[in-house]
């Protein structure tokens, strides 16, 4: 982040405007205060605004309400790679669009799951993370159970949606629960995949048949070892990002870039009719 500020300081004297493209928003998960935490993301955005940044471009920010930290002179543009991911998923996977359920692994990802579900005209389910407030492990209250809230999964294709995989433990526990509930196939979709605890857990879960594939993007660094696995499908968002940058640079409208629903709906209709 300091390097970004140095570059801004170096160029802002001559630049007509400064746009910062930050696919994974700095400190985006430190976005609210529950106890005595610092509001790192809000402070970072205000620093960029004070340095004269006119626009910040980011993708699938953890909480879009963070833009309220800079409501005036800096434009905050949050894009979703949802349609780019869905195009690849619909094209590559065999599934019945009439037997799909979208699953949120916790309450925070529910809006994402609902968007996907509305595109497919499908049902949505959710897991509630039950935590043990008497203990603190790695700075957090440990999760003791994932409680499923939703309809019957017997014979369904379950698609788990989240913005980020850190260690991936919760995602894999959810996948295991879905298989126990009778889901025929389980797919995982995440914009950012960090694999902070390595790949062993995912490799074992895949070998055990807990999930079919993980769809993720190249909007942040991904270990080459993950890309080489049979269960990881990387979605290239380079063209999407370049279209955004070019449109902003030429003062064009970004509305079309934020709305690609019709293409997905057409692909889904073709899938239902066996034409894809």
What role is predicted for each listed range?
Residues 1-276:
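PRPP-associated nucleotide enzymes
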């Amino acid at each position: 982040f300091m390097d970004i500020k140095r570059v801004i300081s170096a160029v802002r004297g001559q630049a007509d405007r400064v746009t910062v493209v930050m696919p994974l928003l700095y400190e985006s998960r430190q976005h609210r205060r529950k106890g005595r935490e610092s509001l790192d993301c809000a402070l970072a955005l205000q620093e960029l605004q004070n340095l004269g940044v006119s626009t910040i471009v980011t993708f699938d920010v953890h909480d879009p309400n963070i833009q309220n930290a800079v409501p005036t002179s800096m434009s905050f543009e949050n894009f979703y790679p949802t349609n780019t991911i869905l195009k690849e998923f619909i094209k590559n996977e065999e599934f019945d669009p009439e037997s799909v359920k979208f699953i949120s692994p916790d309450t925070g990802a529910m809006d994402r799951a609902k968007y996907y579900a509305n595109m497919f005209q499908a049902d949505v389910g959710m897991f509630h993370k039950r935590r043990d407030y008497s203990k603190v492990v790695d700075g957090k209250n440990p999760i003791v159970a994932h409680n499923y809230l939703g309809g019957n999964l017997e014979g369904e294709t379950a698609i788990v949606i989240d913005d980020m995989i850190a260690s991936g433990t919760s995602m894999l526990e959810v996948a295991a629960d879905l298989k126990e509930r009778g889901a025929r196939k389980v797919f995982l979709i995440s914009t950012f995949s960090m694999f902070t605890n390595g790949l062993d857990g995912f490799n074992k879960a895949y070998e055990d048949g807990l999930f079919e594939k993980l769809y993720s993007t190249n909007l942040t660094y991904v270990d080459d070892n993950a890309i080489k696995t049979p269960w990881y499908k990387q979605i290239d968002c380079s063209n999407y990002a370049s279209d955004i940058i070019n449109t902003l640079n030429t003062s064009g409208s970004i509305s079309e870039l934020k709305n690609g629903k019709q293409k997905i709906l057409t692909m889904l209709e073709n899938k239902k009719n066996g034409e894809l």
